[in-house]
Amino acid sequence: DANFWKTSPNTEIVKAEIAKGNNPAEANVNAFDVTTLAINNEAPVETIKFLIDQPGNSITKLTHDNRIYLHWAAYKGNTELVQYLIAKGSDVNFEDSHGTAPADFAASNGQSNPEMYEAFFKAGVNPTKKYANGANLLLLAIASDKDLKAADYFSTKGMSLKDVDANGNTAFTYAARSGNIAL
C-alpha cells in the first residue's frame, strides 16, 4: 500500500510489519514491489536499504517494466540511494523493457542533480552516450531544466545545447515539448 510509505516509516516500523506477516518482497499486480513503493514514496534511505537486504529482494530484482531499484532511485533523484546501490554493484547500464538505463530514466524524468550523475559517470557510464533516438542526457533533461543548471553541468561533460539526436531534434525541440515558453 503506497499510503503506508507516505508516512516515512523507519526500519523498526517496517520490522514490526514484517513480524505481523507482511512480505517485504511482495509485488502488486503491476510488479511494483514493497521496495519500489518505498523508493517512489521517498521512505527513509535506511528503511530502503533494510528492505533491499530482505529475502526475495536484491539489487538485481526486476520490478515494473523490468526495472531494477537503481532505476527507481535515479527516477526519484535519490542520490544517496543511487550511490549505495552502485557501491553494492548495481548495474548502471541495465536496460528496462523499454531500453532505458537508470541515468537516462532520471534525465527523462527531470532529475538534474550533478552529484547523482557523477556517481553514474564514476561507475562507468559514458557521459556522451547516445540513448533512444540518439539523444544524450542533456537533450533528455532539457525539458525539465528550468534554470539550465543541468545543461550547464552536462556541457562540462562534453554535451552541448547544439547537440542533435538521430532524428535532427535539437535541445530547442526537446524543450518545446515541455510547453515551457520561457525555457
Task: Describe each region flagged by the PLM.
Residues 1-21:
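Sec-dependent signal peptide cleavage junction
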Residues 1-5, 25-39, 60-72, 95-107, ...:
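Ankyrin-repeat boundary/"N-cap" motif
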Residues 5-9, 37-44, 72-78, 105-114, ...:
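Ankyrin repeat A-helix N-terminal signature
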Residues 14, 31, 44-45:
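Short amphipathic alpha-helical segments that mediate assembly, nucleic-acid/protein binding
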Residues 14-20, 36, 77, 81-92, ...:
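Generic detector of contiguous secondary-structure segments
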Residues 15-23, 49-58, 83-91, 118-127, ...:
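Ankyrin repeat domain, specifically the short helix-to-loop turn at the C-terminus of the second helix
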Residues 64-108, 112-124:
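Long, mid-chain structured domain cores
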Residues 110-183:
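Solenoidal tandem-repeat scaffolds enriched in leucines and small polar residues
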